[in-house]
Regions:
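Accessory RNA 3′-end/elbow-binding domains used by RNA modification enzymes
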Residues: 1-26, 32-49, 53, 57, ...
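Glycine-rich loop at the start of a catalytic domain that most often binds anionic cofactors/ligands
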Residues: 60-70, 75-79
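Short, charged/polar surface micro-motifs in flexible loops or helix N-caps
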Residues: 28, 66-70, 90-91
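The conserved catalytic core of RNA pseudouridine synthases
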Residues: 40-44, 62-65, 155-187, 191-202
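Acidic, low-complexity central loop/insert segments
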Residues: 74-130
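Structural signature of FAD isoalloxazine-binding scaffolds in flavoprotein oxidoreductases
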Residues: 73-88, 156-170
Length: 314
């Protein structure tokens, strides 16, 4: 038996796959299917994504492999940026192009919408808002997804939830297509935002296209298509390091002695043995000799409390 076919050797190779793939998800592919395909190409043992994109949406889908999966929750909680095309004048039952038209504005209404009206409408949705989640969503009630109820013709009462629209930029309007850029908090449905903008303009709307361009500190720079991934001779070279997920947190460098204690899960009182301790308490990246050890909470009086640890230095 050759080493290349030795199951133990293959397992060792799979265990070595650590990092983040910045995938440009295509239209029509679910986030889970994208993850399965990428995991197969990379021959990875452990994989996870950082929050789903609807099948009709495209753009940045960060996929985590190996040790990076320990930190995927950080991007689930992170702010996200999208470029969206809102089709004014037609409302669908799903809020996007996959649904059926249920309302159509009278002729001429959409053509009469002005840039000033759009700017005024967008201003209403900047900052903290309350948003009612859509029926066509993966939220659950009594163990059953909302979209399953919707497909049965059942509409549930849904409570509005607080979300924050950090940025809402008017890009262009060529009737009936309105292009916007949205930066929003976790839990925001851009489909619903598009519908609400249409309602504010008095003409109804649905989302015609959606492209995600940023998730937390990760941007479209270095993003790769599924086709390019599958065709690449050395796909593992496409992975960003694990700490790419944590770039928004300040860092601490530990001596070798402190690093051993940190990896044992010990709380550390930092003194001269740590370099460049952040001034404010909070979450930090922890390194030793330039290698990521994990994350921790920097507490008052320079106490470092381990949080998530890397099994092998990254």
């Amino acid at each position: 038996m050759t080493q290349g076919r030795d199951p133990k050797h293959i397992k060792r190779l799979r265990d070595l796959v650590d990092g983040v793939l910045l995938l440009d998800k295509p239209v029509g592919l679910s986030s889970n299917d994208a993850l399965i395909r990428a995991k197969r190409v990379l021959n990875a043992k452990k994989a996870g994504h950082t929050g789903t994109l609807d099948p009709f949406a495209t753009g940045l889908l960060p996929l985590c492999f190996g040790e990076a999966t320990k930190f995927s929750q950080d991007l689930l909680e992170a702010d996200k940026t999208y470029e969206a095309t809102v089709h004014l004048g037609i409302k669908t039952n799903t809020g996007d192009t996959e649904g059926e038209a249920i309302e159509t504005a009278p002729a001429g209404v959409v053509d009469a919408v002005t840039d000033a009206q759009i700017e005024a409408a967008l201003a209403r949705f900047r900052g903290p808002i309350m948003q009612v989640p859509p029926m066509y969503s993966a939220l659950k009630r009594d163990g059953k997804a909302y979209y399953e109820y919707a497909r049965e013709g059942i509409t549930l009462e849904r409570e509005a939830r607080p979300v924050t629209i950090h940025g809402l930029e008017f890009i262009s309007y060529e009737a009936p297509m309105l292009k916007i850029r949205v930066t929003c908090s976790k839990g925001t449905y851009v489909r619903v935002l598009g519908e609400d903008i249409g309602a504010a303009l008095g003409c109804g709307a649905h989302l015609n296209a959606l492209r995600r361009t940023q998730v937390g500190p990760l941007t479209i720079d270095g993003m790769i298509t599924m086709e390019a991934l599958q065709a690449h001779a050395e796909p593992l070279t496409l992975l960003a390091p694990v700490d790419a997920l944590l770039a928004s947190f300040p860092s601490i460098e530990l001596t070798a002695e402190l690093a051993v204690r940190f990896l044992q899960g010990q709380r550390l009182a930092l003194g001269k043995e740590a370099v460049a301790v952040p001034a404010e308490p909070g979450r930090v990246r922890v390194y030793s000799d330039g290698k990521l050890l994990g994350t921790a909470q920097l507490q008052e009086y320079a106490i470092l409390a381990p949080e998530r640890l890397i099994a092998k230095a990254a």
